[in-house]
Curated annotation (Swiss-Prot):
Residues 9-21 have a biased composition (Basic residues). Keywords: Cytoplasm, DNA-binding, Transcription, Transcription regulation. PANTHER family: TRANSCRIPTIONAL REGULATORY PROTEIN YEBC-RELATED (PTHR12532:SF6), TRANSLATIONAL ACTIVATOR OF CYTOCHROME C OXIDASE 1 (PTHR12532). It is found in: Cytoplasm. It comes from the Bacteria. HAMAP family: Transcrip_reg_TACO1. Disulfide bonds: none annotated. This is Probable transcriptional regulatory protein CT_457. One of its GO terms (cellular component) is cytosol. Residues 1-21 are annotated as: Disordered. GO terms for molecular function: DNA binding.
């Protein structure tokens, strides 16, 4: 899964988990702004906005933050956000996928080039890395809310395909992208807490690296994750 490697120590994983939580909040706010730009600021008539506001509340984003960004989104000066995907090869044949949501694609592309110049790797043509990954739906279930055995039983009953427990904070219930909404609703009906649901990339095979190569890849991945516009970085390093 994204962000997990045997070359990352416990402190490193904790720092990255905290960083990822901040990225999740940031992406939700960008999704909120995008929803307003596309469908207007009234959640009663904008179903997508209504869904994202609920997601923000589920993530414990303060109401004042939500209201402030609703006003911000209604401003003519606020640009809309676009989703962009970049593909890279790191060291030792490791594939990397970067997902970003940006209001300035030129800025994001420049930041990606800087990352490669500073930390190595190579940006490649679309499709060059994606074939090593599968697109999946994922429901994020807090680990403190349920034990793994119970969730596994619920997952099977609800139409999920697999349960990933690698994340420090969440179980990920995986399913086909087209089944994500129905799997989430079925889990909620069984009393399972779903903090977030989204589409992710899952590696089809993992690439083994020696220690030096692994650490070089982690340095590149960290740099990519710290780009402001970047929301997710996926890799297939073991």
């Amino acid at each position: 899964m994204a962000g997990h490697s045997k070359w990352a120590n416990t402190k490193h994983r904790k720092e990255r988990a905290d960083h990822k939580k901040g990225k999740i909040f940031s992406r939700t706010i960008k999704e909120l702004i995008s929803a307003v730009k596309m469908g207007g600021p009234d959640p009663k008539s904008n179903a997508r906005l209504r869904m994202i506001i609920q997601k923000a509340k589920d993530q414990n984003i303060p109401n004042e933050n939500i209201e402030r960004n609703l006003k911000k989104a209604s401003s003519a000066d606020q640009k809309n956000y676009e989703e962009v995907t970049y593909e890279l090869y790191g060291f030792g044949g490791v594939g990397i996928i970067v997902e970003a949501m940006t209001d300035n694609k030129n800025r994001t592309a420049s930041d990606m080039r800087v990352a490669v110049n500073k930390r190595g790797g190579a940006l490649v043509e679309p499709g060059s890395v994606l074939y090593n990954f599968s697109r999946k739906g994922a429901c994020y279930v807090p680990k403190h809310s349920i034990d793994e055995a119970s969730l596994l039983t619920h997952m099977i009953d609800c139409g999920g395909e697999d349960l990933d427990s690698d994340d420090e904070e969440f179980f990920l219930v995986l399913c086909e992208p087209t089944d994500l909404a129905s799997v989430k609703e079925a889990l909620l009906a069984k009393g399972v807490t779903c903090s977030e649901e989204r589409l992710i990339y899952v590696p089809l095979r993992l690439v083994d690296c020696d220690e030096e190569t692994g650490k070089s890849n982690l340095a590149l991945i960290e740099w990519l994750e710290n780009i402001n516009d970047v929301d997710d970085v996926y890799h297939n390093m073991a």
